[in-house]
Amino acid sequence: MGTVQLPATPLCIDDVNTYAKDLKIPNFVGCHMIDLLPSKSRKKECGIVNLESSSEKGSHWVCWYKNGKERIYFDSYGEPPPPELEVYLKTKKELEKSKLCIKQSSVTVQKDDSSECGSLCLYVIYYLSKGYPFEAILNVLLNRYRKPHPLTIHNV
């Protein structure tokens, strides 16, 4: 078992997919642009998505984690999930009733001048896949936001 220090620099799709593979994140369905999400959601999965379409160069990485009925969305700026991801994660009935069923953060854990959103997403889905509570992961990231230090994953 070792540690992996995630970069504070921008990551491309290939970088994210390589880190996810190296970290052995279970049920990872890949890194996608918002218009190229998988065709169907699985019962247990996680992934990372860029908020721009495939015709654009990319702007910001966000992620989701799904384990049965539990669905979690993470944006390092605390923004709500984009409509495309809500459609992907919710059932037809939940969409029709505008049901709030995706747990999400509303806190900012990334500085405006930072490009580490991809690394933050990898950190979140890695620890969610290990069974850590979302709130505990957010607390670690909030403390790091207040006192910046390298983003390190332990016990890989």
What do the PLM-derived regions correspond to, one by one?
Residues 1-62, 66-71:
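Cysteine protease catalytic domains with a Cys-His-Asp triad
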Residues 31, 100-107, 139, 151-153:
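Hydrophobic transmembrane signal anchors and adjacent membrane-proximal interface regions, especially
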Residues 13-21, 86-89, 138-139, 150-154:
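Generic detector of well-ordered alpha-helical segments enriched in charged/polar residues
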Residues 2, 8-15, 83, 132-134, ...:
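General structural signal for secondary-structure boundaries
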Residues 20, 24, 93-96, 145-146:
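Generic secondary-structure transition motif, activating predominantly at the C-termini of alpha-helices
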Residues 46-129:
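Cysteine protease-like catalytic core of ubiquitin/ubiquitin-like
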